[in-house]
Amino acid sequence: MSEKAKLIQLIHIGKQQLNMDEFSYREMVKRLTNKTSSTKCTVVELLKILHEMQQKGAKVKHFAKRGTKPTAYSPATGEVKVKSEIAHKIRAVWIQMGKHGFLADPSXKALNSYMRKVMNKGKSVLALNVGALNSNDASRFLEILKKWHKRVMLKRLAEKYGCITSAETGYDELCLVFKNYQGVA
């Protein structure tokens, strides 16, 4: 079933849940999209209709298609409240490691799991996710991640390309060298 067909189906379920008569339904569709039928709407317009119905109390949920590769790396910078702004840099390094192929699971869930494993050893107050780290802990965890990333980049450069780069090379500089060899953004 196509994305459009699923959305139309959800809209009709929402219409039933809200006990909308045909006239009210068509007026709402026309007001939101300037079209008289949901079958003539684009996917974006259908999402707009579905959102309106959810605002009115319909209990329908739209789930995006799951791809074969995990693409939900991490929330965008502005979408999440964090104690320390360093958490955004931590997420960026994690995503970069995923794009370089060093992580089996580059999701935010995997990042938080790894952070708990590394940072909660011997602590009385436990951090549940990267956003909950204070500035000191976030800095420490960022350095741990960068050292790991640097280590695996050096190893890959040496094994795959025969490129010997000094261990004293800075993290950002090494990322550029790796990017040039890999062609990875």
Curated annotation (Swiss-Prot):
Listed InterPro entries: Phage_Mu_Gp16
Superkingdom of source: Bacteria
Similarity comment: family membership: To phage Mu protein gp16.
The protein, known as: Mu-like prophage FluMu protein gp16
Source species: Haemophilus influenzae (strain ATCC 51907 / DSM 11121 / KW20 / Rd)
